Protein backbone atom coordinates (compact mmCIF):
# COMPACT_ATOMS: atom_id res chain seq x y z
CA UNK A 1 0.00 0.00 0.00
CA UNK A 2 2.87 2.37 0.80
CA UNK A 3 4.40 1.75 -2.63
CA UNK A 4 1.03 2.30 -4.30
CA UNK A 5 0.67 5.68 -2.64
CA UNK A 6 4.24 6.62 -3.56
CA UNK A 7 3.47 5.72 -7.18
CA UNK A 8 0.31 7.83 -7.11
CA UNK A 9 2.19 10.78 -5.62
CA UNK A 10 4.51 10.88 -8.64
CA UNK A 11 1.58 12.06 -10.73
CA UNK A 12 0.66 14.82 -8.28
CA UNK A 13 2.39 17.67 -10.18
CA UNK A 14 0.39 16.81 -13.30
CA UNK A 15 -2.92 16.80 -11.42
CA UNK A 16 -2.03 20.04 -9.63
CA UNK A 17 -1.43 21.64 -13.00
CA UNK A 18 -4.88 20.52 -14.12
CA UNK A 19 -6.47 21.89 -10.95
CA UNK A 20 -4.92 25.31 -11.67
CA UNK A 21 -6.14 25.38 -15.28
CA UNK A 22 -7.73 28.78 -15.77
CA UNK A 23 -10.60 27.43 -17.86
CA UNK A 24 -11.63 24.83 -15.30
CA UNK A 25 -11.22 27.47 -12.61
CA UNK A 26 -13.40 29.89 -14.57
CA UNK A 27 -16.21 27.33 -14.82
CA UNK A 28 -16.02 26.61 -11.10
CA UNK A 29 -15.88 30.29 -10.12
CA UNK A 30 -18.64 31.12 -12.58
CA UNK A 31 -20.93 28.64 -10.85
CA UNK A 32 -19.95 29.95 -7.42
CA UNK A 33 -20.91 33.48 -8.50
CA UNK A 34 -24.23 32.16 -9.80
CA UNK A 35 -25.02 30.16 -6.67
CA UNK A 36 -27.54 32.71 -5.28
CA UNK A 37 -29.68 32.14 -8.39
CA UNK A 38 -29.47 28.36 -7.97
CA UNK A 39 -30.30 28.34 -4.26
CA UNK A 40 -33.05 30.96 -4.60
CA UNK A 41 -34.83 28.92 -7.27
CA UNK A 42 -34.66 25.76 -5.15
CA UNK A 43 -36.72 27.39 -2.40
CA UNK A 44 -39.73 27.39 -4.70
CA UNK A 45 -39.16 23.78 -5.73
CA UNK A 46 -39.28 22.72 -2.08
CA UNK A 47 -42.45 24.74 -1.43
CA UNK A 48 -44.13 23.40 -4.56
CA UNK A 49 -43.28 19.71 -4.29
CA UNK A 50 -42.32 18.73 -0.74
CA UNK A 51 -46.03 18.64 0.30
CA UNK A 52 -46.50 15.86 -2.28
CA UNK A 53 -44.78 13.49 0.14
CA UNK A 54 -47.81 13.78 2.45
CA UNK A 55 -50.35 13.42 -0.35
CA UNK A 56 -51.04 17.15 -0.68
CA UNK A 57 -50.86 18.68 -4.17
CA UNK A 58 -51.18 22.35 -4.98
CA UNK A 59 -53.70 23.36 -7.63
CA UNK A 60 -52.28 23.98 -11.11
CA UNK A 61 -52.71 27.74 -10.71
CA UNK A 62 -50.79 27.83 -7.42
CA UNK A 63 -48.13 25.47 -8.79
CA UNK A 64 -47.65 27.79 -11.76
CA UNK A 65 -47.51 30.77 -9.39
CA UNK A 66 -44.82 29.07 -7.27
CA UNK A 67 -42.73 27.93 -10.24
CA UNK A 68 -42.66 31.30 -12.02
CA UNK A 69 -39.69 32.58 -9.95
CA UNK A 70 -37.91 29.29 -10.72
CA UNK A 71 -38.46 29.72 -14.46
CA UNK A 72 -37.15 33.29 -14.34
CA UNK A 73 -33.99 32.32 -12.41
CA UNK A 74 -32.92 28.69 -12.86
CA UNK A 75 -34.73 28.67 -16.20
CA UNK A 76 -32.14 31.07 -17.64
CA UNK A 77 -29.16 29.90 -15.57
CA UNK A 78 -26.88 29.43 -18.59
CA UNK A 79 -27.43 33.06 -19.56
CA UNK A 80 -26.16 34.20 -16.15
CA UNK A 81 -23.33 31.67 -15.97
CA UNK A 82 -22.13 32.70 -19.42
CA UNK A 83 -21.49 36.14 -17.95
CA UNK A 84 -20.01 35.06 -14.62
CA UNK A 85 -17.70 32.53 -16.30
CA UNK A 86 -16.46 35.23 -18.67
CA UNK A 87 -15.82 37.50 -15.71
CA UNK A 88 -13.84 34.79 -13.87
CA UNK A 89 -11.74 34.00 -16.94
CA UNK A 90 -11.13 37.71 -17.54
CA UNK A 91 -9.71 38.02 -14.03
CA UNK A 92 -7.28 35.17 -14.76
CA UNK A 93 -6.21 36.63 -18.10
CA UNK A 94 -5.67 40.07 -16.54
CA UNK A 95 -2.95 38.65 -14.31
CA UNK A 96 -0.74 38.35 -17.39
CA UNK A 97 -1.46 41.86 -18.65
CA UNK A 98 0.00 45.19 -17.47
CA UNK A 99 -2.02 47.00 -14.83
CA UNK A 100 -2.43 49.90 -17.25
CA UNK A 101 -3.87 47.75 -20.04
CA UNK A 102 -6.48 45.45 -18.52
CA UNK A 103 -9.48 43.71 -20.07
CA UNK A 104 -12.80 45.22 -18.98
CA UNK A 105 -14.65 42.34 -17.30
CA UNK A 106 -18.01 44.11 -17.56
CA UNK A 107 -17.61 44.26 -21.32
CA UNK A 108 -16.61 40.58 -21.61
CA UNK A 109 -19.62 39.62 -19.50
CA UNK A 110 -21.99 41.51 -21.79
CA UNK A 111 -20.38 40.20 -24.97
CA UNK A 112 -20.49 36.63 -23.69
CA UNK A 113 -24.16 36.93 -22.76
CA UNK A 114 -25.07 38.42 -26.14
CA UNK A 115 -23.10 35.73 -27.95
CA UNK A 116 -24.80 33.04 -25.88
CA UNK A 117 -28.25 34.38 -26.78
CA UNK A 118 -27.36 34.24 -30.46
CA UNK A 119 -26.36 30.57 -30.14
CA UNK A 120 -29.10 29.35 -27.79
CA UNK A 121 -32.27 31.44 -28.05
CA UNK A 122 -34.42 31.05 -31.15
CA UNK A 123 -36.97 33.76 -32.04
CA UNK A 124 -40.54 33.09 -30.94
CA UNK A 125 -43.36 33.53 -33.47
CA UNK A 126 -45.21 36.01 -31.28
CA UNK A 127 -42.05 38.02 -30.58
CA UNK A 128 -39.23 37.67 -28.10
CA UNK A 129 -37.30 34.40 -28.01
CA UNK A 130 -37.61 30.84 -26.77
CA UNK A 131 -35.84 29.90 -23.54
CA UNK A 132 -35.67 26.10 -23.85
CA UNK A 133 -31.86 26.15 -24.07
CA UNK A 134 -31.21 29.14 -21.82
CA UNK A 135 -31.30 27.05 -18.65
CA UNK A 136 -29.17 24.07 -17.72
CA UNK A 137 -29.41 22.64 -21.26
CA UNK A 138 -27.34 25.55 -22.52
CA UNK A 139 -24.49 25.48 -20.01
CA UNK A 140 -21.87 24.07 -22.38
CA UNK A 141 -22.82 26.70 -24.95
CA UNK A 142 -22.42 29.36 -22.25
CA UNK A 143 -18.88 28.12 -21.56
CA UNK A 144 -18.03 28.30 -25.26
CA UNK A 145 -19.36 31.86 -25.45
CA UNK A 146 -17.32 32.89 -22.41
CA UNK A 147 -14.07 31.28 -23.57
CA UNK A 148 -14.26 32.65 -27.12
CA UNK A 149 -15.19 36.14 -25.93
CA UNK A 150 -12.41 36.51 -23.38
CA UNK A 151 -9.73 35.19 -25.74
CA UNK A 152 -10.83 37.60 -28.47
CA UNK A 153 -10.64 40.45 -25.97
CA UNK A 154 -7.17 39.40 -24.84
CA UNK A 155 -5.84 39.34 -28.40
CA UNK A 156 -7.33 42.75 -29.13
CA UNK A 157 -6.24 44.40 -25.88
CA UNK A 158 -2.75 42.88 -25.87
CA UNK A 159 -2.12 43.99 -29.46
CA UNK A 160 -3.89 47.35 -29.05
CA UNK A 161 -6.54 46.48 -31.64
CA UNK A 162 -8.84 49.08 -30.13
CA UNK A 163 -10.17 52.56 -30.82
CA UNK A 164 -8.05 55.14 -29.03
CA UNK A 165 -9.59 58.44 -28.01
CA UNK A 166 -7.78 61.73 -27.31
CA UNK A 167 -6.40 62.14 -23.80
CA UNK A 168 -8.91 64.84 -22.89
CA UNK A 169 -11.84 62.42 -23.36
CA UNK A 170 -13.15 61.14 -19.98
CA UNK A 171 -11.84 57.63 -19.12
CA UNK A 172 -15.31 56.08 -18.97
CA UNK A 173 -16.06 57.27 -22.52
CA UNK A 174 -12.64 56.10 -23.75
CA UNK A 175 -13.28 52.66 -22.28
CA UNK A 176 -16.50 52.33 -24.30
CA UNK A 177 -14.63 52.87 -27.57
CA UNK A 178 -11.73 50.68 -26.44
CA UNK A 179 -14.17 47.81 -25.94
CA UNK A 180 -16.07 48.33 -29.19
CA UNK A 181 -13.80 46.36 -31.53
CA UNK A 182 -13.30 43.26 -29.30
CA UNK A 183 -17.01 43.30 -28.44
CA UNK A 184 -17.95 43.36 -32.11
CA UNK A 185 -15.41 40.74 -33.17
CA UNK A 186 -16.37 38.26 -30.43
CA UNK A 187 -20.14 38.60 -30.96
CA UNK A 188 -19.84 38.39 -34.76
CA UNK A 189 -17.59 35.34 -34.43
CA UNK A 190 -20.11 33.55 -32.20
CA UNK A 191 -22.98 34.57 -34.46
CA UNK A 192 -21.03 33.22 -37.43
CA UNK A 193 -20.68 29.89 -35.62
CA UNK A 194 -24.43 29.85 -35.02
CA UNK A 195 -25.17 30.55 -38.70
CA UNK A 196 -22.77 27.81 -39.78
CA UNK A 197 -24.29 25.20 -37.47
CA UNK A 198 -27.85 26.29 -38.25
CA UNK A 199 -27.19 26.15 -41.97
CA UNK A 200 -25.54 22.74 -41.73
CA UNK A 201 -27.61 20.92 -39.10
CA UNK A 202 -30.77 22.98 -39.02
CA UNK A 203 -30.60 23.57 -35.25
CA UNK A 204 -28.92 26.03 -32.89
CA UNK A 205 -25.44 25.52 -31.46
CA UNK A 206 -26.96 24.81 -28.05
CA UNK A 207 -29.32 22.15 -29.39
CA UNK A 208 -26.60 20.50 -31.49
CA UNK A 209 -24.28 20.29 -28.47
CA UNK A 210 -27.09 18.78 -26.41
CA UNK A 211 -27.67 16.10 -29.04
CA UNK A 212 -23.94 15.42 -29.37
CA UNK A 213 -23.28 14.89 -25.67
CA UNK A 214 -26.51 13.05 -24.81
CA UNK A 215 -24.78 9.63 -25.04
CA UNK A 216 -22.03 10.90 -22.73
CA UNK A 217 -24.61 12.04 -20.19
CA UNK A 218 -26.26 8.61 -20.29
CA UNK A 219 -22.94 6.80 -19.89
CA UNK A 220 -21.93 9.02 -16.98
CA UNK A 221 -25.15 8.07 -15.18
CA UNK A 222 -24.28 4.35 -15.27
CA UNK A 223 -22.45 2.38 -12.58
CA UNK A 224 -19.07 2.75 -14.31
CA UNK A 225 -19.55 6.47 -14.80
CA UNK A 226 -20.51 7.22 -11.20
CA UNK A 227 -17.67 5.02 -9.96
CA UNK A 228 -15.06 6.94 -11.94
CA UNK A 229 -16.50 10.38 -11.18
CA UNK A 230 -17.07 10.08 -7.46
CA UNK A 231 -14.03 7.89 -6.91
CA UNK A 232 -11.95 10.65 -8.48
CA UNK A 233 -13.18 13.20 -5.91
CA UNK A 234 -11.77 11.11 -3.08
CA UNK A 235 -8.67 9.96 -4.96
CA UNK A 236 -7.43 13.48 -5.68
CA UNK A 237 -8.10 14.65 -2.12
CA UNK A 238 -6.25 11.66 -0.70
CA UNK A 239 -3.05 12.56 -2.55
CA UNK A 240 -3.27 16.21 -1.50
CA UNK A 241 -5.10 17.83 -4.42
CA UNK A 242 -8.43 19.61 -4.07
CA UNK A 243 -10.54 17.14 -6.06
CA UNK A 244 -13.52 19.41 -6.78
CA UNK A 245 -11.21 21.83 -8.63
CA UNK A 246 -10.67 19.10 -11.22
CA UNK A 247 -13.87 17.06 -11.20
CA UNK A 248 -16.64 19.62 -10.59
CA UNK A 249 -16.02 21.79 -13.68
CA UNK A 250 -15.93 18.66 -15.84
CA UNK A 251 -19.36 17.45 -14.68
CA UNK A 252 -21.06 20.75 -13.77
CA UNK A 253 -23.17 20.81 -16.92
CA UNK A 254 -24.39 17.25 -16.25
CA UNK A 255 -25.19 17.71 -12.56
CA UNK A 256 -27.26 20.87 -12.96
CA UNK A 257 -28.95 19.69 -16.15
CA UNK A 258 -30.00 16.46 -14.42
CA UNK A 259 -31.57 18.38 -11.55
CA UNK A 260 -33.70 20.22 -14.08
CA UNK A 261 -34.57 17.00 -15.94
CA UNK A 262 -35.59 15.32 -12.68
CA UNK A 263 -37.81 18.26 -11.77
CA UNK A 264 -39.63 18.13 -15.10
CA UNK A 265 -40.08 14.37 -14.77
CA UNK A 266 -41.68 14.86 -11.34
CA UNK A 267 -43.91 17.60 -12.73
CA UNK A 268 -45.06 15.18 -15.43
CA UNK A 269 -45.79 12.49 -12.83
CA UNK A 270 -42.89 10.34 -14.02
CA UNK A 271 -39.90 8.73 -12.30
CA UNK A 272 -36.96 11.13 -11.71
CA UNK A 273 -34.13 8.73 -12.52
CA UNK A 274 -31.06 10.90 -13.18
CA UNK A 275 -28.45 9.97 -10.58
CA UNK A 276 -25.58 12.38 -11.23
CA UNK A 277 -26.72 15.61 -9.58
CA UNK A 278 -25.28 18.21 -7.25
CA UNK A 279 -27.17 16.53 -4.40
CA UNK A 280 -25.56 13.17 -5.15
CA UNK A 281 -22.15 14.76 -4.97
CA UNK A 282 -22.75 16.77 -1.78
CA UNK A 283 -24.95 14.46 0.29
CA UNK A 284 -24.30 10.93 -0.98
CA UNK A 285 -20.71 10.67 -2.23
CA UNK A 286 -19.30 13.34 0.09
CA UNK A 287 -21.65 12.94 3.04
CA UNK A 288 -19.71 14.68 5.78
CA UNK A 289 -17.08 15.86 3.31
CA UNK A 290 -14.91 14.15 0.72
CA UNK A 291 -14.45 10.49 1.55
CA UNK A 292 -17.94 10.23 3.08
CA UNK A 293 -16.44 10.94 6.51
CA UNK A 294 -19.61 11.90 8.39
CA UNK A 295 -19.30 8.91 10.71
CA UNK A 296 -15.52 9.04 11.20
CA UNK A 297 -15.36 11.65 14.01
CA UNK A 298 -18.01 9.68 15.91
CA UNK A 299 -15.94 6.51 15.53
CA UNK A 300 -12.88 8.38 16.78
CA UNK A 301 -14.85 9.56 19.83
CA UNK A 302 -16.69 6.34 20.66
CA UNK A 303 -14.51 3.38 19.74
CA UNK A 304 -10.97 4.75 19.91
CA UNK A 305 -8.99 4.22 23.10
CA UNK A 306 -6.09 6.57 22.39
CA UNK A 307 -6.40 10.03 23.92
CA UNK A 308 -5.14 11.65 20.75
CA UNK A 309 -7.74 10.12 18.45
CA UNK A 310 -10.60 10.76 20.87
CA UNK A 311 -9.58 14.42 21.12
CA UNK A 312 -9.43 14.72 17.32
CA UNK A 313 -12.89 13.17 17.06
CA UNK A 314 -14.40 15.61 19.56
CA UNK A 315 -12.80 18.60 17.83
CA UNK A 316 -13.90 17.62 14.32
CA UNK A 317 -17.41 16.22 14.85
CA UNK A 318 -19.33 19.51 14.49
CA UNK A 319 -17.60 20.89 11.36
CA UNK A 320 -17.68 17.46 9.70
CA UNK A 321 -21.43 17.22 10.36
CA UNK A 322 -21.78 20.32 8.17
CA UNK A 323 -19.49 19.00 5.44
CA UNK A 324 -16.30 20.76 6.59
CA UNK A 325 -14.05 17.76 7.20
CA UNK A 326 -10.55 19.27 7.02
CA UNK A 327 -10.11 18.89 10.81
CA UNK A 328 -10.40 15.11 10.56
CA UNK A 329 -8.59 14.89 7.20
CA UNK A 330 -5.49 16.69 8.45
CA UNK A 331 -5.86 16.10 12.17
CA UNK A 332 -5.95 12.29 12.12
CA UNK A 333 -4.58 12.46 9.42
CA UNK A 334 -6.65 10.55 6.88
CA UNK A 335 -5.10 11.98 3.73
CA UNK A 336 -1.91 10.19 2.65
CA UNK A 337 -2.49 7.66 5.44
CA UNK A 338 -2.14 4.17 3.90
CA UNK A 339 -4.51 2.72 6.51
CA UNK A 340 -7.38 4.89 5.25
CA UNK A 341 -6.75 4.63 1.50
CA UNK A 342 -9.32 1.87 0.94
CA UNK A 343 -12.25 3.27 2.98
CA UNK A 344 -11.63 6.85 1.84
CA UNK A 345 -11.94 5.85 -1.83
CA UNK A 346 -14.41 2.98 -1.40
CA UNK A 347 -17.04 4.55 0.90
CA UNK A 348 -18.13 7.29 -1.57
CA UNK A 349 -18.36 4.75 -4.38
CA UNK A 350 -20.46 2.34 -2.31
CA UNK A 351 -22.71 5.22 -1.29
CA UNK A 352 -23.51 6.18 -4.88
CA UNK A 353 -23.98 2.52 -5.83
CA UNK A 354 -26.58 2.16 -3.09
CA UNK A 355 -28.25 5.39 -4.13
CA UNK A 356 -28.43 4.24 -7.75
CA UNK A 357 -29.96 0.95 -6.58
CA UNK A 358 -32.64 2.89 -4.69
CA UNK A 359 -33.36 5.00 -7.78
CA UNK A 360 -33.22 2.29 -10.45
CA UNK A 361 -34.63 -0.70 -8.56
CA UNK A 362 -36.78 0.71 -5.75
CA UNK A 363 -38.08 3.59 -7.93
CA UNK A 364 -37.01 6.31 -5.52
CA UNK A 365 -36.98 9.75 -7.16
CA UNK A 366 -33.51 11.27 -7.44
CA UNK A 367 -32.59 14.83 -6.41
CA UNK A 368 -34.71 17.60 -7.92
CA UNK A 369 -33.51 20.59 -5.85
CA UNK A 370 -30.17 22.28 -5.23
CA UNK A 371 -29.31 22.87 -1.58
CA UNK A 372 -26.41 24.63 0.20
CA UNK A 373 -23.40 22.32 0.50
CA UNK A 374 -23.20 22.89 4.27
CA UNK A 375 -26.56 21.15 4.77
CA UNK A 376 -25.89 18.03 6.90
CA UNK A 377 -25.78 14.97 4.64
CA UNK A 378 -28.80 13.03 5.96
CA UNK A 379 -30.93 16.19 5.98
CA UNK A 380 -29.77 17.05 2.46
CA UNK A 381 -30.85 13.62 1.23
CA UNK A 382 -34.33 14.00 2.70
CA UNK A 383 -34.85 17.62 1.59
CA UNK A 384 -33.33 17.21 -1.86
CA UNK A 385 -35.57 14.25 -2.70
CA UNK A 386 -38.77 15.82 -1.33
CA UNK A 387 -39.18 13.84 1.91
CA UNK A 388 -39.80 10.46 0.31
CA UNK A 389 -40.07 7.57 2.77
CA UNK A 390 -37.21 5.85 0.97
CA UNK A 391 -35.01 8.91 1.54
CA UNK A 392 -35.15 8.39 5.32
CA UNK A 393 -34.27 4.72 4.87
CA UNK A 394 -31.44 5.61 2.48
CA UNK A 395 -29.93 8.18 4.86
CA UNK A 396 -29.91 5.70 7.74
CA UNK A 397 -28.55 2.90 5.57
CA UNK A 398 -25.64 5.00 4.31
CA UNK A 399 -24.64 5.88 7.86
CA UNK A 400 -24.66 2.18 8.78
CA UNK A 401 -22.73 1.13 5.66
CA UNK A 402 -20.09 3.85 6.08
CA UNK A 403 -19.70 2.80 9.71
CA UNK A 404 -19.09 -0.80 8.64
CA UNK A 405 -16.57 0.32 5.99
CA UNK A 406 -14.56 2.62 8.25
CA UNK A 407 -14.81 0.67 11.54
CA UNK A 408 -12.00 -1.89 11.03
CA UNK A 409 -9.61 0.70 9.62
CA UNK A 410 -10.25 3.10 12.50
CA UNK A 411 -9.57 0.25 14.96
CA UNK A 412 -6.29 -0.62 13.24
CA UNK A 413 -5.19 3.01 13.26
CA UNK A 414 -6.20 3.45 16.88
CA UNK A 415 -4.13 0.44 17.90
CA UNK A 416 -1.15 2.02 16.17
CA UNK A 417 -1.59 5.37 17.93
CA UNK A 418 -2.38 3.67 21.25
CA UNK A 419 0.87 1.72 21.06
CA UNK A 420 2.76 4.95 20.42
CA UNK A 421 1.12 6.55 23.46
CA UNK A 422 1.94 3.57 25.68
CA UNK A 423 5.56 3.48 24.59
CA UNK A 424 5.94 7.23 24.73
CA UNK A 425 7.29 7.24 21.19
CA UNK A 426 5.70 9.03 18.27
CA UNK A 427 6.15 7.84 14.71
CA UNK A 428 6.61 11.01 12.68
CA UNK A 429 6.84 9.29 9.28
CA UNK A 430 3.21 9.94 8.36
CA UNK A 431 3.34 13.46 9.74
CA UNK A 432 6.36 14.17 7.56
CA UNK A 433 4.61 12.66 4.53
CA UNK A 434 1.57 14.90 5.02
CA UNK A 435 3.85 17.88 5.56
CA UNK A 436 5.71 17.18 2.33
CA UNK A 437 2.58 16.83 0.24
CA UNK A 438 0.69 19.70 1.83
CA UNK A 439 3.76 21.93 1.96
CA UNK A 440 4.06 21.72 5.75
CA UNK A 441 7.84 21.91 5.95
CA UNK A 442 7.83 24.82 8.41
CA UNK A 443 4.63 23.96 10.27
CA UNK A 444 6.30 22.84 13.50
CA UNK A 445 8.52 25.89 13.63
CA UNK A 446 5.63 28.25 12.99
CA UNK A 447 3.43 26.57 15.56
CA UNK A 448 6.23 26.56 18.08
CA UNK A 449 6.69 30.29 17.68
CA UNK A 450 2.95 30.74 17.96
CA UNK A 451 2.85 28.86 21.25
CA UNK A 452 5.54 31.13 22.68
CA UNK A 453 4.11 34.31 21.24
CA UNK A 454 0.58 33.71 22.44
CA UNK A 455 1.76 33.86 26.05
CA UNK A 456 1.96 37.58 25.65
CA UNK A 457 0.18 38.53 22.46
CA UNK A 458 -0.78 41.99 23.58
CA UNK A 459 2.61 42.90 25.05
CA UNK A 460 4.52 41.87 21.94
CA UNK A 461 2.00 43.30 19.51
CA UNK A 462 3.62 44.85 16.43
CA UNK A 463 0.34 45.82 14.74
CA UNK A 464 -0.57 49.38 15.68
CA UNK A 465 -2.97 50.35 12.89
CA UNK A 466 -6.11 48.64 11.65
CA UNK A 467 -5.12 45.58 9.64
CA UNK A 468 -7.53 43.60 7.50
CA UNK A 469 -6.93 39.89 6.97
CA UNK A 470 -8.62 37.76 4.31
CA UNK A 471 -8.71 33.98 4.77
CA UNK A 472 -9.39 31.99 1.61
CA UNK A 473 -10.30 28.33 1.28
CA UNK A 474 -12.05 26.34 -1.45
CA UNK A 475 -15.64 27.12 -0.53
CA UNK A 476 -15.62 29.54 2.39
CA UNK A 477 -16.13 26.86 5.06
CA UNK A 478 -12.94 26.46 7.10
CA UNK A 479 -11.85 29.99 6.23
CA UNK A 480 -14.79 31.18 8.33
CA UNK A 481 -13.52 29.17 11.30
CA UNK A 482 -10.10 30.82 11.16
CA UNK A 483 -11.53 34.30 10.55
CA UNK A 484 -13.83 33.94 13.56
CA UNK A 485 -10.95 32.74 15.73
CA UNK A 486 -8.88 35.75 14.68
CA UNK A 487 -11.66 38.25 15.33
CA UNK A 488 -12.36 36.89 18.82
CA UNK A 489 -8.69 36.93 19.79
CA UNK A 490 -8.18 40.42 18.34
CA UNK A 491 -11.08 41.74 20.42
CA UNK A 492 -9.85 39.98 23.56
CA UNK A 493 -6.29 41.31 23.28
CA UNK A 494 -7.24 44.69 21.83
CA UNK A 495 -5.22 44.16 18.65
CA UNK A 496 -6.50 46.15 15.61
CA UNK A 497 -7.02 43.14 13.35
CA UNK A 498 -10.22 42.40 11.44
CA UNK A 499 -10.57 39.13 9.55
CA UNK A 500 -12.98 38.03 6.83
CA UNK A 501 -13.49 34.71 5.07
CA UNK A 502 -14.03 33.88 1.43
CA UNK A 503 -13.73 31.28 -1.29
CA UNK A 504 -10.82 31.33 -3.70
CA UNK A 505 -12.03 32.67 -7.03
CA UNK A 506 -14.66 34.95 -5.55
CA UNK A 507 -12.11 37.19 -3.85
CA UNK A 508 -10.87 39.58 -6.50
CA UNK A 509 -13.24 42.50 -6.04
CA UNK A 510 -12.62 42.71 -2.29
CA UNK A 511 -8.87 41.99 -2.43
CA UNK A 512 -7.71 45.66 -2.40
CA UNK A 513 -9.36 46.14 1.01
CA UNK A 514 -6.97 43.74 2.78
CA UNK A 515 -3.41 43.87 4.08
CA UNK A 516 -2.80 40.13 4.43
CA UNK A 517 -4.21 37.08 2.65
CA UNK A 518 -4.02 33.63 4.24
CA UNK A 519 -4.47 30.62 1.95
CA UNK A 520 -5.92 27.43 3.40
CA UNK A 521 -4.22 24.12 2.46
CA UNK A 522 -6.97 23.29 -0.07
CA UNK A 523 -6.00 26.27 -2.22
CA UNK A 524 -2.29 26.48 -1.39
CA UNK A 525 -1.45 25.14 -4.86
CA UNK A 526 -2.70 28.49 -6.20
CA UNK A 527 -0.02 30.39 -4.29
CA UNK A 528 1.92 31.54 -7.38
CA UNK A 529 -1.22 32.77 -9.16
CA UNK A 530 -2.40 34.52 -6.01
CA UNK A 531 0.99 36.12 -5.44
CA UNK A 532 0.82 37.72 -8.87
CA UNK A 533 -2.37 39.45 -7.70
CA UNK A 534 -1.22 40.43 -4.21
CA UNK A 535 2.16 41.74 -5.36
CA UNK A 536 0.43 44.20 -7.69
CA UNK A 537 -1.53 45.56 -4.73
CA UNK A 538 1.26 45.44 -2.16
CA UNK A 539 -0.56 42.85 -0.04
CA UNK A 540 1.21 40.22 2.04
CA UNK A 541 0.42 36.59 1.20
CA UNK A 542 0.99 33.46 3.24
CA UNK A 543 -0.08 29.86 2.75
CA UNK A 544 -0.83 27.51 5.59
CA UNK A 545 -0.22 23.82 5.89
CA UNK A 546 -2.40 20.88 6.86
CA UNK A 547 -2.32 20.35 10.61
CA UNK A 548 -1.03 23.89 11.17
CA UNK A 549 -4.14 25.40 9.59
CA UNK A 550 -6.51 23.21 11.59
CA UNK A 551 -4.69 24.08 14.82
CA UNK A 552 -4.96 27.80 14.07
CA UNK A 553 -8.73 27.54 13.53
CA UNK A 554 -9.03 26.17 17.08
CA UNK A 555 -6.50 28.51 18.70
CA UNK A 556 -7.39 32.20 18.42
CA UNK A 557 -4.31 33.32 20.33
CA UNK A 558 -2.03 31.25 18.15
CA UNK A 559 -3.79 32.49 15.02
CA UNK A 560 -3.33 36.10 16.10
CA UNK A 561 0.34 35.47 16.84
CA UNK A 562 0.66 33.87 13.41
CA UNK A 563 -0.73 37.04 11.80
CA UNK A 564 1.61 39.22 13.86
CA UNK A 565 4.59 37.18 12.65
CA UNK A 566 3.76 38.05 9.06
CA UNK A 567 4.41 41.73 9.85
CA UNK A 568 7.70 41.23 11.73
From Swiss-Prot:
- Top enzyme class of this protein? transferase
Q: Name one GO biological process term.
A: phosphoenolpyruvate-dependent sugar phosphotransferase system
Q: Where is the active site?
A: 473
Which reaction is catalysed here? lactose(out) + N(pros)-phospho-L-histidyl-[protein] = lactose 6-phosphate(in) + L-histidyl-[protein]
Induction notes from the record: By lactose. The operon consists of lacABCDFEGX. A second transcript of only lacF and lacE is also lactose-induced.
Using the record's annotations, give every residue carrying the modification Phosphocysteine: 473
- Topological type in the membrane: Multi-pass membrane protein
Q: What remark does the entry add?
A: This gene was sequenced from pMG820, a laboratory-derived deletion of the naturally occurring plasmid pLP712.
**What's the stated role of this polypeptide?**
The phosphoenolpyruvate-dependent sugar phosphotransferase system (sugar PTS), a major carbohydrate active transport system, catalyzes the phosphorylation of incoming sugar substrates concomitantly with their translocation across the cell membrane. The enzyme II LacEF PTS system is involved in lactose transport.
What is the name listed in the Swiss-Prot or TrEMBL entry for this protein? PTS system lactose-specific EIICB component
Taxonomic source organism: Lactococcus lactis subsp. lactis (Streptococcus lactis)
Gene assigned in the entry? lacE
Amino acid sequence: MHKLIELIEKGKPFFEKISRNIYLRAIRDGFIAGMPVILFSSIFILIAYVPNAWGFHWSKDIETFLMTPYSYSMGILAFFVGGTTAKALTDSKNRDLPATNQINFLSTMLASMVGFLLMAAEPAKEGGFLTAFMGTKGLLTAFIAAFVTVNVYKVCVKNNVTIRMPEDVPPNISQVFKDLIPFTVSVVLLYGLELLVKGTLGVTVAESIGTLIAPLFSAADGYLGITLIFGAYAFFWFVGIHGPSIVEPAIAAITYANIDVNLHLIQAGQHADKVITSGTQMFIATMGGTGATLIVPFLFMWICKSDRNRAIGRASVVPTFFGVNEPILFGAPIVLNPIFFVPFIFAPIVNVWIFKFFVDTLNMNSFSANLPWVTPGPLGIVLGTNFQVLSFILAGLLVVVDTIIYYPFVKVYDEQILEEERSGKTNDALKEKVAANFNTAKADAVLGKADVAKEDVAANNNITKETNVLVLCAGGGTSGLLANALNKAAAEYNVPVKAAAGGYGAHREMLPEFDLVILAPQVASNFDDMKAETDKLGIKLVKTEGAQYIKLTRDGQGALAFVQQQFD
